[in-house]
């Protein structure tokens, strides 16, 4: 049996890119050595201000006294103040600044200046002479020590601070990069959930759907004893690190004041069904063999509580053309050819909590004609869509999904009456091309609050509505795999029913099936554990 993950598919291409990139670097270094001697410099002046990105890269694990020679001719740094000591929750005496300058990356640095740090406010723009100071890591935090207050010049106030949304997993993977920067941990819940009497004080893990990160609150913080912690919120704050005896950095997130916390919801919004995978392009002809995989988060009797699944195919030949005037129901306006959307009604059968079920073609085979039968699996709705129109809308078609180019996707809805205003309970998209969203007219495909999408802009001050795919930050999508290879797209993650959220966001793993592949390959841990990936590639787990 053959199985390739998307990561594995990229190895060869990435290796070649590294070879090319390293060759370019070698050539650039050689040319620079030959042609950039100081006496031959063709003009210009070295900036007095060293980017914080470059400053941090000077540190190699030992204290470094800074001077013009090791700072490439510079003597100072500049940045925007992000520290706010009014809440008494930041390391005492640290002035923390960040800069968005080099390579489009945000980098920050901390400067211990004692009580004077409290005199600066977020948004102050400062220039700091650091010649003669020492770059060192103290208490786990990289700092510029030995800077006097007189070396700091405030040149402006009220400068905007970027709302930098960062996944907790990225912070944990690269703690040095995010240290001393202002970040937003979005859609975060306490894990484990806290009691109503809990306070902020101490270390509490929060989860944003990517990983857990520690929310740290000093016992002396002005809000340490505040109660009624939020069920789901955005936590703005500054990342600081702790360092163990082996030099390993562990990040923690510190809000500055309670103004850094933005509540999103007070009760769980549990999806009764979640999308866990799809077969959009079997080996051979697709017609009647495409299928979608789901998992129930509770017992459902579809005869009592009906659902529906809608597939959208935005290939150039689908009808009607242009933006989806009726959203997911746009296929109802097609009269000939392939319709833009196609619907399956789920009105019979039952499914238990944690059970997989399928919707799709009547072929019920794992990888197209002549492959392993899936007829014994739980199929809630299956019919030959090459011969029959959809349930309510959608014209018969040889392919539900596009295999490349413009975007395709599918969503599951509670109920069978779908119109322009109907929101799904879960949705995924593959690709982003085509006429999908028109901001001026408000036409598009509606999304749900998931690990991928948000119905409001969680970083906006007034939670601006973003109800459609490609509106606001709703730009995430899965990718198309190589055509006609028989890739099943496994979407593995962890969904917490009690919290109504993804504790680990879904990851697309493309498994190249054969005609004899077993059901366990798309429902179990496959590929299995390895030295590189000890957990293997499991399907979505309901917690």
Identify the function of each model-found stretch.
Residues 37-267, 534-537, 543:
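OB-fold single-stranded nucleic acid-binding module
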Residues 44-87, 260-318, 392-407, 418-431, ...:
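A structural motif detector for short, solvent-exposed N-terminal "entry" segments of globular domains
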Residues 151-165, 175-232, 306, 379-527:
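Conserved beta-structured recognition patch
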Residues 103-105, 312-325:
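Short aromatic-acidic-glycine turn motif
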Residues 107-167, 332-436:
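Secretome/extracellular-domain signature
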